[in-house]
């Protein structure tokens, strides 16, 4: 069985907005009084400024554990200090091009259970976590890729345990899809539950045809686009 599982994401576009903050570790931390950066970077990947993808940074210090300068620190500080412009603050014409090679991580939190009122359940919401930052694109002359569909992508090894077919909902403008459920591997050598949606007919047929279940899990690789969407 393979031990090096793939978990990669790629995001490039215009710097849309951010929630980055300078924080200081508490007295009970391993390194008290250490400054670090935390927050989200939002990147808009399409010309219509509709597909906004976030990348979360939980703990970035000026130096790495090996004592070397961490390039992420200077990049994030450039954003905080306004050296790098955002769509929200400065408009799309002045916004900086940004590229981040990240990975899928998870934000775990408790929320009220719909199935069991009065109780709470643990939710693992997937998100892009960390990664090195470049202020250019992978297109010609450092510009953004011409194909917008390649500007926010993911590739993951996955253990599929369920595939559910969902019909289209015309009233809510939702397409038919196959919901792929399973487990993915993160850099901490941990596994987390995850869902992906397949909307292309060939992809739907492939995943539904696997007949995956908890008793018959299927290990494979999935890849595709990251689309932000608002469901009404």
Language model features with spans:
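OB-fold and OB-like single-stranded nucleic-acid-recognition modules
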Residues: 1-232
């Amino acid at each position: 069985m393979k031990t090096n599982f793939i978990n990669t994401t790629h995001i490039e576009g215009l710097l849309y907005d951010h929630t980055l903050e300078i924080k200081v570790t508490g007295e009970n931390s391993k390194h008290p009084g250490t400054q670090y950066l935390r927050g989200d970077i939002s990147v808009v990947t399409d010309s219509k400024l509709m597909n906004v993808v976030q990348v979360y940074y939980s703990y970035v210090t000026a130096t790495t554990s090996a004592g070397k300068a961490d390039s992420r620190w200077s990049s994030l500080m450039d954003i905080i200090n306004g050296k790098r412009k955002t769509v929200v603050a400065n408009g799309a014409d002045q916004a900086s091009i940004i590229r981040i090679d990240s990975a899928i991580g998870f934000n775990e939190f408790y929320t009220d259970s719909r199935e069991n009122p009065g109780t709470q359940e643990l939710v693992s919401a997937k998100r892009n976590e960390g990664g090195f930052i470049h202020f250019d694109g992978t297109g010609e002359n450092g510009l953004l890729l011409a194909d917008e569909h390649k500007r926010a992508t993911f590739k993951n090894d996955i253990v599929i345990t369920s595939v559910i077919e969902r019909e289209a909902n015309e009233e809510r403008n939702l397409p038919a899809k196959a919901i792929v459920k399973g487990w993915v591997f993160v850099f901490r050598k941990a596994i987390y539950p995850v869902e992906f949606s397949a909307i292309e007919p060939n992809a739907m047929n492939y995943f539904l045809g696997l007949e995956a279940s908890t008793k018959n899990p299927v290990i494979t690789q999935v890849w595709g686009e990251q689309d932000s969407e608002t469901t009404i």
